[in-house]
Structure formats: C-alpha cells, structure tokens
C-alpha cells in the first residue's frame, strides 16, 4: 500500500495549541505528516523561518510520524508534489475559514488535480485561537499559556519583552 503523506502548510507565527491539535489528529489519520512553515507575503512575521521550525520541532518531538520543514518560496501544490504529499491538511475554526479554505482547495486543484484537501474542524476549546490574536495579546503583556504550547509561550515572552521595556 502506498504511504499516505499529508502536508500541513501554514505561517505558524506563532504555532498555537489549535495547530498542535490539528497536527496530532492528522498524525492519526496519515502515515506521515509534514508541517511546512511558509512565508506569507501578506503578513509581517514575528519569528523568522528557522525559529518557527525549531519551536515546532520542540513541540512535536513526541510525534514520530510528524516532521517540520521550511517551505521554499513556491506554490504549496508544487511543494506537496516535491515531498510526495497527496493530501493537504487544513484546520477550520468557523464559516469564514471554510469559505477561504474551499477557495484555496479549488485553486490547488488547478495546479494538481490529484491533491486532496482534508479539513479538520477545530475542537471547541481551540476554535477561537488565531496566531494574530495571540501575538496581540502577547505584545501587550497578556497571558498566552492557554493558547500556545509552553515552548512557544516562552519564545513569545522573550521576543516581545524588549518592546515593553
């Protein structure tokens, strides 16, 4: 049987507990899951690519069938082909996410008709978490421990403490 490889692309700036839950669930559905840390030209990143990769590696260390890579500046569909992934994993928090992901899935199909997008609904306890809101809360000194894994919380605190001095 062919190995079922899934790609979970995102900017992950920062990687949240919602992202982690999606990865954990995907790891039970697929033989291998590759987290692709992407550069989103529309966003101003807080963490650089290597830092995000290192943080995510720390967080997923106990997931044997999950790896993380920095995605080169290329289309996600092309990168999926390059790593042998036939599935894209996307987490859905609400109707707005669904609309957006449906359109992206259709566009990805124009690039690779064999690439399937698998949507995982966010669990209730993670449905309100967004990376941009986490960054804003952290930037103003708020508590993010319930929103991000411990290693990410520490990194956020370290990164943003200079702005509050």
Swiss-Prot record:
A biological process from GO: coenzyme A biosynthetic process
Site location (Transition state stabilizer): 19
Summary of subunit composition and partner proteins: Homohexamer.
One term of GO molecular function: pantetheine-phosphate adenylyltransferase activity
Binding site for ATP: 11-12, 19, 91-93, 101, 126-132
A single GO cellular-component term on record: cytoplasm
Entry similarity comment: Belongs to the bacterial CoaD family.
Protein name (record): Phosphopantetheine adenylyltransferase
Keywords recorded for this protein, A-Z: ATP-binding, Coenzyme A biosynthesis, Cytoplasm, Magnesium, Nucleotide-binding, Nucleotidyltransferase, Transferase
Lineage: Bacteria, Bacillati, Bacillota, Bacilli, Lactobacillales
């Amino acid at each position: 049987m062919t190995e079922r490889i899934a790609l979970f692309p995102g900017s992950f700036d920062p990687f949240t507990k919602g992202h982690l839950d999606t990865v954990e669930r995907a790891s039970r559905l697929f033989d291998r899951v590759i987290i692709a840390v992407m550069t989103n030209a529309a966003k101003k990143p807080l963490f650089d690519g290597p830092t995000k990769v290192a943080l995510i590696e720390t967080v997923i260390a106990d997931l044997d069938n999950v790896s993380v890579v920095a995605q080169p500046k290329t289309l996600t569909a092309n990168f999926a082909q390059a790593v042998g992934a036939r599935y894209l994993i996307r987490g859905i928090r609400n109707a707005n996410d669904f609309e957006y992901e449906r359109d992206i899935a259709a566009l990805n199909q124009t690039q690779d008709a064999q690439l399937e997008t698998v949507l995982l609904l966010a669990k209730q306890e993670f449905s309100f978490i967004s990376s941009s809101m986490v960054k804003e809360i952290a930037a103003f000194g708020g508590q993010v421990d319930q929103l991000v894994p411990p290693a990410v919380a520490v990194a956020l605190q370290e990164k943003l403490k200079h702005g509050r001095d």
